[in-house]
Amino acid sequence: MPEPASAPTPTRRGRVPRTPRVLRILVPALLILVWLTAAGIGGPYFGRVDEVSSNDRTAYLPESAEATQVQALADDFSGSDALPALVVVTSEDEITEAELSALTDAGEELTSLEGVIDEVSPPIASEDSLAIQMFVPVDADADVGTVVEQLEQELATEVPEGLTVHVTGPAGFSADLAEAFAGIDGLLLAVALAAVLVILVIVYRSLLLPLIVLSTSLFALCAALLVIWHLAADGVLLLSGQTQGILFILVIGAATDYSLLYVSRYRDELRHRESSWAATVSALRGTVEPVLASGGTVIAGLLCLLLSDLKSNSTLGPVAAIGIAFAMLAALTFLPALLYAAGRVAFWPRRPRYDPASAQEPSSVTGRGVWGRVARAVSRRPRPLWVLTAVVLAVGCIGALSLDADGVPQSDLVLKSSSARDGQAALGEHFPAGVGSPVQVVVDEEDLQATADVLAEAEGIDSVSVTSADYPSGSAPVTAEGIQAQGPPGAPAPDPTVVGGKVQVQGTLADAPDSPAAEQTVRELRTALDQEGFEEIVGGVTATSIDTNDASAHDRALIIPVVLVVILMILMVLLRSILAPVLLVATTVLSFGTALGVAALVFEHLFDFPGADPAVPLYGFVFLVALGIDYNIFLMTRVREEALQRGTREGMVRGLAVTGGVITSAGVVLAATFAALAVIPILFLAQIAFIVAFGVLLDTFVVRTLLVPALTLDIGRAIWWPSRLWRAGGS
């Protein structure tokens, strides 16, 4: 344990109250023990997140959405909660009778697989005889990825040579998502931690200190995951793969940033104080306010997501807020305790030596180091500098106008090769592309025929059917003459399945269910059915996509202004000013616009992405504004502290010089952790990774280094208007 605290030297840095030796030993030991216990209990939950998470898009829609209401009735109409897997078999030549017989036998064998809960439909040949399709009912509560993998393996051995097999449909795409998210608790975490470790080793040129900082981030994540898992298990929160990935990255990045701030203060105090305890207390005093202000601002911004109609967004708010809270807590309790226990050895081989003279030396450091030179350069001609910087950033914003954020097809959500995507393409070549994912209309029984007529007249509908337990396939065809019978002439027509006076009419889409054409068809159907005066609800895969995208667009329009107002109010309280917060928020928004503009150009011309989810700009905004304002908070709280003693100009120059290194390191760490999201082959996460990583670097090296300091220097003491600091002449 470190040496006892000697009598504090009365210097400009202030006295540290004398603390009994027993407390100096007991408090750090207790803190370390508590965090070790939390990490020990929470660590195993990394492997159990799948138990309480779901990637079902319907589950995240509001209960008022039509697609949600239709999904809630699906089990009642079908008699099971099966998720359809669509087997598509193609051939370059016409499929022979022998091959068709072999496929029939293969389909019958599939019923014995675990997770297949009903009879597999017989093979249905395409008109050109170059493909067949079979419907396999998969238990929605089973591990869909495993079931689909077993289907592919079984078919690979049973299907005759020369035939190509794909498993697509809702089950196939669900399996793709499950496989893509499988690397979240392994690959993503490993890449993020490795990136942070490399950066910390470069920053500190030490072996032990980076491990201490990294352990702080990991312990914070373990504790946060422990709490979140139990909240999700109790149904308080809904977790998805993307929420889990963002949580991991956010906690590691934020905890490391806060740790960097504390370590910088602590190392400085060790040079001025002989006692490690006095240095710890003094470092905490200087770190608590900016960390709490920064973390509190991020939490407030994230909690604005609670206003979202989508549960995927409203859940991310509290999940991420819990993560940030534990990141702050770990950086302000576990890290100081661990560093105090390790003493100056933690910085080996560059241990900070106690230098009594340094405590009495003048406080101006602007003449030393890279950031001292940067601060002086900015102070020479601030007005031309901030004008030029603002113009360049504004030009970058223009690209945001070309961002296509109206949603992407389900088949493009996964970036890697996909059997489900290939199967969907093959399906569209030989069958109506919407087979297996029809539009579903729940309507009063007496309106069945009229509803079927509206669907049949729609240009994008290939055929119409009604759910019927009496029909072998479960859906009986409906034409202008009514429900069609199966069997010899004169056979009676089957009765539709009626649930609470309602029937389910299905329309097979002519286009792929995740295509813009299919979405347009469903929107037109909703309008046409409403005009007929039916009391109907329209659901299905396409309707789910429409309702999700519409809710996302609504959230974007509502939440972004609320986040701005909340952060602005927090900054006004923190800086006791009106003008400074307005300028800080404006510069951060400008930075976000530039990041979004550059991202739009990169996505379209470099990566050739098909578009973006409507939630991408919202997530990018919340993370960049909430996290980007962090660095301005770190900078301006120090500037205000210095301005109280030296005036605004000298305070700005000194504040930039003193905080430049640590804030830059924090920005690089946060950018690296968010960039790690790109290792998960999900389009949404890859786009968020680029926008946030690029935006954070832009904020770190341009906005916080050039734009904000130059603006502050040009405006002068008026930046603090209408606070007492402004009335006192800036000092």
Protein language model annotation of sequence segments:
Residues S54, E63-A85, E92-S174, S402-G611, ...:
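Structured non-transmembrane domains adjacent to transmembrane bundles in polytopic membrane proteins
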Residues M1-D50, V116, D139-A405, G533, ...:
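Membrane-embedded transmembrane helical bundles of large multi-pass transporters/channels
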Residues L86-V87, L388-V391, V439:
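Short coil/turn segments at secondary-structure boundaries
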Residues T58, S358-E361, Q410-D412:
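Charged, low-complexity surface segments at secondary-structure and domain boundaries
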Residues A7-T9, V87, Q133:
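Short stretches within intrinsically disordered, low-complexity N-terminal or propeptide regions
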Residues T37, R57-L61, A67, S91-E94, ...:
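N-terminal extramembrane/targeting module of integral membrane proteins
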Residues N55-R57, I184:
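Short, charged low-complexity linear motifs
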